[in-house]
Regions:
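Gly/Pro/Ser/Thr-rich low-complexity, intrinsically disordered segments predominantly at protein N-termini
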Residues: 1-227
């Protein structure tokens, strides 16, 4: 698979402390109790599998068999961006994909953290020409030196753009990312019900002042529509 799971130790959900309770508070037992479960010691290490969520566009062969990956769409998360716990793993996998001739589309909706590629202007650092959200499309064909990287930036009051993704033999597919986002949000009723337009999205302080004003205006219109 193009994305290899990362193994990690699970974080504790509960912290156990020690209370100074006199031993006389507990009834005495003359014999040690028998354990209710007995396993190998290695079972004490809880190792989980973590995978990156992504969408793969694959070739379909002439006999209707699913072929190799042509394009890979990745929704960036805090863990695979700069300074994240999965940054090294993700950088390795993206390099592997690009060297393999796979078109890579990266959706970065995290305005409060720098872009994954240092050549892209950074919104949180106040770089000129930076946008709070970006979609980058890297086509490494015929090779990385001759391939192209295209970055589509958009603001807080602009619809997510429609982008043409190159496939094989000159074929392209136009993907309307705004429609995908809206339909996904609407289909996840738990999220739509939790949307509180009386509150500004967080972290609101990481937006530029002019963008905070635009967000407040959009929120006000949404509040008037839903109330």
């Amino acid at each position: 698979d193009d994305i290899t799971p990362k193994r990690f130790l699970a974080k504790p959900d509960v912290t156990i402390g020690r209370l100074n309770i006199p031993s006389s508070s507990f009834p005495e037992q003359s014999l040690a109790v028998t354990p209710t479960i007995e396993l190998d010691a290695e079972e004490a290490i809880d190792i989980e599998e973590a995978t990156y969520g992504a969408v793969a566009i694959r070739q379909v062969t002439s006999n209707n068999q699913i072929g190799e990956v042509v394009a890979w769409l990745e929704l960036l998360s805090p863990s695979n961006k700069r300074g994240g716990s999965g940054e090294a793993q993700y950088q390795h996998k993206r390099t592997q994909a690009l060297h393999g001739g796979i078109v890579l589309i990266e959706l970065d909706y995290l305005h409060h953290s720098p872009p994954i590629m240092r050549r892209i202007p950074s919104y949180p650092d106040g770089d000129e020409g930076a946008y709070p959200y970006t979609i980058s499309l890297t086509d490494p064909r015929p090779n990385l030196k001759e391939g192209k990287l295209k970055v589509y930036g958009f603001g807080v009051d602009i619809a997510i753009p429609t982008i043409e993704i190159p496939l094989l033999n000159g074929d392209k597919i136009a993907v309307n990312f705004d429609t995908i986002y809206q339909r996904t949000f609407a289909s996840l009723r738990a999220y739509s019900l939790r949307a509180d337009y009386d509150q500004l999205p967080q972290p609101i302080g990481a937006y530029h002042p002019q963008d905070r004003e635009k967000i407040a205006q959009v929120n006000q219109r949404a509040h008037e529509t839903t109330s």
